[in-house]
């Protein structure tokens, strides 16, 4: 069904109040959007992180009389008569279908392709990972995932054990298996990620070589030849003592989910245990790799 969208611009401090006002005026959902496309990362648990200059967008049923909505909002102390706003009629679309139509096969490195499960593979002779991300993070479109996939493609993983720490959709663990790893272990705090990884592993015929664990269930003394963690800078720093013991002596470590401006602080958390390589950047993101001492 079609919808009507009303957009207000405000400060982060006032965004929650205006969100409540829109809901009281009949909005069925509210979205906060950064006016200037400023990245925001790592909100605290339970925190709604807002920007200094925030668009508050209310979605209304197509039958809503927006003149009545505007009249209600004009009585709000933060708005007043003639407040600035924008009203748009949204086209009736199958949004899930549109997303699927825009997700195309992507190549990473020399051998590896990530292909949506609903599309044909572009190269039958390549290493093809068929992916349906479901509700979990990880499609290959984000620079951090791309950096990790390119790194895995550059390695000789034949017969190796790989740990994907924060596995999301399972894209990195499954790619490692398709690239020749003997076994991969995926760890994630989200049960939905575990299920998405399991489904994608079955789709790619590697489920018998993929072990999946919530952190509370992971085996003690777990070790791997290659460890990859594409999460966020804060957790990478905080979990450095745990992540650093996962690679065997001489094993490889790959970290991403890190802004280039955060690279130095993440490196400091690992430099005592690893011989680190030069940081590799892609757009505003980066990848840190190294070999266990």
Swiss-Prot record:
UniProt cross-references to SUPFAM superfamilies, sorted A to Z: S-adenosyl-L-methionine-dependent methyltransferases
Give the EC number. Answer: 2.1.1.-
- Location, primary (coarse class): cytoplasm
Location in the cell reads: Cytoplasm
Sorted alphabetically, the keyword list is: Cytoplasm, Methyltransferase, S-adenosyl-L-methionine, Transferase
Keyword 4Fe-4S recorded? no
Matching NCBIfam families: prmA
Its annotated function is as follows: Methylates ribosomal protein L11.
What protein name does the entry list?
Answer: Ribosomal protein L11 methyltransferase
